[in-house]
Amino acid sequence: MADETRRDFLKAAAAATLGAGVPAQAQTSATSSTPSAGPADRPADLILRNGKIITVDVGFSIAQAIAIAGERIVAVGPDAAMAAHTAPWTRVIDLKGRPVIPGLIDGHAHMDREGLKAIYPSLGRVRSIRDIQDRIAELARGKKPGAWIVTMPIGDPPYYFDVPNILAEKRWPTRQDLDAAAPNNPVYIRSIWGFWRHSPPLVSCANTEALKRAGITRDTVSPVSTLKIEKGANGDPTGVFVEQDMQPLAELIWFRKATAFGRADRARTLPLAARAYHAFGTTSIFEGHGAATELLRAYMDAYRDGTLSMRSSLVFSPNWKTAGNAPLGPLIEAWAGWLGEPGPGNDRLKVTGLQVSINHGAADDLRAGTTPDTGWAGFNYDAGMPRERLKEVLLHCAANDIRAIAMANVTPGVIDLFEEVDRLIPLKGRRWVVAHISSLSPRDIEKIVRMGLVLTTHTNAFIYKQSDLMKRRLPPERHREITPVRDLLDAGVKVSLVTDNVPVSMFLPIWQVVSRMNIRQELVAPEQAISRAEALRCATENGAYLTFDEDKKGSLAPGKLADLAVLSADPLSVAETELRDISAAMTMVGGKIVYETTNWRG
């Protein structure tokens, strides 16, 4: 690579760093905010009493009350012990027996997507093409002629199951259907992000004016075999695009200008997204799939504006295309100052670690061509690279104390690859992450233990929605290897639960690892079930361990951050079938209420 090109790549990489824009108060080392317990008689600003405080401490103790001063916990214990922390100004809330847990920590959240869903009008609950036409016509009445009309997908969120069969016509709307509803405007109905449903196809629909603006005619040829431009008997496009993939391409290459999420859109909707997660008791997230530059900047904007209520640990998603075949050692070394552990940031926002994966396909190259726009992804589509090239990157990461995060479902053999690195530079203590585990053999688990790897699950996929696929991949005698959380915990592995934004409640994965129930009400490797207490620990303490924050959060103890949730039901005693339906009555981050339902104290 020419020196000039390489300098451009280094410059672009530097521009993505938080160091270029983190306020001074956020550039302190992560270790600077290690908590220290206050004096036993310190007055509290707030006391929650007469409750069931599930501390998730070492002994999983249960208390009645918790006292908070500033952003930290000063006492946990019986109601009577709170007198020592009560001052004239102390606010006291009677929990009336309600359960309280540490704030939940989502180990792979994709939180930003929840806010982005609010930008475009919903087509949820439509049951006919006429319903769709009525919605589009209503939107057209509020638009000037020629202005774009873009909507969310057809179907009912969060999963968008059984489309188009939910429509009376059992088909997708054509361009003519949409023309009739909005003859003077270009119309585009987006496809789903495939991981919401975990099954293709992804289908989007456009009217005649939208096709014209996209330059799509009867002669247009799809750039990849997985994307079909549906055409009628006369050879003209019908306006329907069908993708046998999980990440939409049509909207990126043909309708990008109409569908792109701007930096302001991302920053503006992050608070909406955070509130949706807070509604189920989540107070911290880890974005293990990585954040591209546009998403990093959006988080920084929200942080500067004081609207980022969620504690957010981000991972960098690189754009490798510009690097070409140049040696990557100097680049990784240059990143060490802001991606290493501990890195810049604070308890509210930090970026540490590098998301890595093996290879990418032709469709990913096309998606990457839209950089810096990343659509629903929020990560760079060309983060994958050949195995030997990736090994080079991993060795440089290990040498520079940069943590690597890889998703097992898109990085085949990642544990073996990490082991090759471990033979040269020991990984123990570095907490490298294997995400989206689907199945693990006993030998895999032995390697994980030896290297001290941290794991994040994806139970919404591999237990709930795709267990049939997992069973087909493995012989019956190996079905116990499907998301083997029981075996992992017994081996001492730290496992963090995740939502992947499908949907946002952490009580779904909590229920899934306890019940091992799939969408068809079938048990999946039931011998791998764990207890409710263990599931809560995976969703709290282990999530804190994932981000090197176990001394600051993850349990309710004096000196720790006052991140907690008052729940609608007791996760330790509610009927198992109702465990997944638990929500938060009140959620608190750093001693401040960030979410509460109306009259929850009544």
Q: What spans do the regions from the language model cover?
A:
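Divalent metal-binding segments
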Residues: 38-49, 54, 58-336, 343, ...
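Short, charged, surface-exposed secondary-structure boundary motifs
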Residues: 214, 322-325, 465-469, 507-508, ...
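N-terminal secretory signal peptides and thylakoid transit peptides that target proteins
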Residues: 1-16
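Hydrophobic h-region of N-terminal signal peptides that target proteins for export
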Residues: 18-23
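His/Asp/Glu-enriched, well-ordered alpha-helical/loop segment
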Residues: 394-407, 412-432, 436-438, 442-446, ...
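Boundary at the C-terminal end of the N-terminal hydrophobic targeting segment
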Residues: 24-28
